[in-house]
Amino acid sequence: MNIFRTFVVVNNFSKFSLKMELSKEILVSNFSKYKKRLITYVGEQEAESIIEELGGDDAVMNATYANTDNTGLAYEGSFTETVIALTVYAIKINDLLPEEKQVSKESIAKVALLSQIGKVLLFKPQTNDWRRKNLGENYTYAELDGAIRVGERSILIAMNSGVKFTEFEFEAMRIMDKQNENADNYSKYFSGTLSMVIKQANEMIDIINRKH
């Protein structure tokens, strides 16, 4: 039986129902929505190439957004579901800004849809029952080439697929990587509006879903 967790977003944000176990129909529907948006904002050829780089339709459709149970986002299909919500939040946060401070919807959607794609490759199911039961590790880390962060890997995948970024889009693609960086204080604390919108949307995802 599917497990529902419903939440209401402040400031008249939309309501979403996140399931810890998604039916096949929901998985397919979410993937279809994600792919359609990806084609809209990066182009059909680029979108197809990205999905292929990530392992194909099934890999993206079934991918998790996180690895531990306490995040509330470590389940099959959470990647597309969460990224769709992230895109909506980011656009609505932008709408709350004074008009002269707002950034383009196209750039917001592009970055929101692409900035986490590295996670599709990053996680694989945890096969250690003890770690699953005692540590809540539903997924573990896959062995990937290069010691690079999610945002950096996402940029690499997108650019290898023909996607081009403006300076502000490139910065925003890495904004969540910067949270744990101490050396690059300037770029961490003096980021553009697009980066701040994406950062706030990511923080909303965490607050809404994290188990306390």
Where are these regions (language model features)?
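Non-catalytic interface/linker regions that flank or bridge core catalytic/transmembrane domains
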Residues: 7-8, 16-67
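Divalent metal-dependent catalytic cores for phosphoryl transfer on phosphate-bearing substrates
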Residues: 67-81, 88-89, 93-99, 103-211
